[in-house]
Amino acid sequence: MSTPPTTHATATAPAVTFSTAPSVATLHLVHVGDTEAGMLAEEHGGGVARAAAVITALRQRAGKAVVVHAGDTLIPAPELAVEIPWPADQATPKPKLASPLLVANNSLGLHVAVPGNHDFDLGEAFLADVIKKSSFPWVASTLRIGGGPLAALVEPGPIWLDDTAPAPAAGRIAPRARRCLGERQGDRCDGVVVGVIAAVPESLRLLSAGAQHVEVPADVDGTVAALKAQVDALRAEGTGIVVLLSHRQGITRDFALLQAGLVGVDVIVSGGGENRLVPTGQRHLPGAAVDPLCTSEPLGCYPVWRTARDGAPVALVATDGGLHTVGALSLSFDAAGVATGVEPGSRPWFLDEETLLELRAEVDRGLLRLELGTRDALAPLQEVLGEVDVWLEGRRELVRNQETNLGSLTADALLRAAQRHQPDVVAAFRNSGAIRDSIGVVTPDGRRLGKPVTLLDLKSALRFDSAVVVVELSHAALAATIEAALVGAGTGQGRFPQVSAGVELVFSRSGRDQQVRLEEGRVKEILEPGTRLVRLVVPGPTGPVVIVDGGVVLAPAARVRIATIDYLAGGGDGWFPGQTVVVVPTPSTEHAAFRALVADPAAVRQSLAVTGRVIAAP
């Protein structure tokens, strides 16, 4: 067993003290998260075939592991929409058609998953069908399902997580789960029991319009209370170690759970934030930045350590999204279930050939056929829509924190589409969270270049194809909306704004976030105005119109007409907070708008030439 480390502390990471009692049990946790549609291998690595091979190898190393998914198992994407014959082998003469993405998820060897916000994007009926077809069960401790298609899948009590596929509880949703690390007969476990609970974001209905018949806690305290009830139940059932799958949009929000008093949890697997926790010297996605925690944590960033209010150490782990990495955490515990240290070999494993060799992992030929068949099914989407000679930037860590050329191009497309039907629309505003990928090619030496834009590129980058709408509102309401879009600016929020040409948006990194009250998953009222928006200018019929200057709305009652997408107009991502606005539909969608723009070389050049739209100030 590893030697317990010395107590450490920094200004941001409080002291963590491990038990010095003898270690009597080891938890081997294998985890992924935010895989969305990332089932196909790319030039650098990744893909479901490699992922399944690595997970299998890690399970064999461990002897008895717990394999979990931290949410967002899918997202609206071509890989989900197309169908291929499966199983693709000669032993099945008449294979059924199946979504390759769902087949991929069932091939990973998961014991359990938590539903993420994107799992709801296509509605509860679709998610219910996905869960029914899953080879593993789901856990959602803070999700109250009051009706709708998911209600029939709810398992009121705890479920056991077994190695059989499909699992006995496959296709069910439970508030908590247990896994026996020894031999089990019925509910009797000869060994340590690991409990699994799960949290969804309090903002679930802001993040996904498909969540209609579910309720979530209104705030962090409510989430802590819901989790505590399941922790207490697990402890009463003889559980020794508790793992929390948290899809609350990133590890900093999970720190907040501990600060709010969550106790009894030993490990938190963070999802929804795609925190790239990669220690120095370990391989990761080429060209991608590691999480800042990896340079600030005294005990390293895999895992990150925090202390609960009862003094117990809590390990937090996460992986980047898109099925590029599999995490493997091994922790030792004393007889009281308190962590004594991290076992050697705990690390994130980047899914490349070097990892396969190091782990002696064997890739399943059937999963290689799955990837090949998926590529064949996607081939008709290689229709070229237009030529763009520069890389269009849609990487999450960039587009959610700053202006990017792809964000600007999509906003300009919305404006063009809206103005065809409503000529007096002056600007377009959109969120960054709906931009899911870049468009371009990465050369072997890491350069990012432009390429012909295909239909597949479009469907991969803009996966939701929301309707284009026109919103009429006051200058004060627009300023409040941009304040809502700037909440958490700099921390990778999907609500972060991208704007059309002619807009000048200056925001303060040090400004105060807007505070709101939620009701039934939507912003009911603004409790405290934000102070991030410094300046906002939009085009006008006779020249630029200054809406906000120095943080002050100059003409609050004046009216303006803007283009956006229906998801935001309906209050998604917290936009248009507590407002009743005039929404005028158009016949266009995001895809149609983008296709029209990218087919016009002059319009593309003009759009890409206009930069400096969104400016960060101190």
Name these PLM-found stretches.
Residues 2-350, 409-416, 428, 472, ...:
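Acidic, metal/ion-coordinating pockets
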Residues 15-28, 32, 36-40, 44-48, ...:
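Catalytic centers of hydrolytic enzymes
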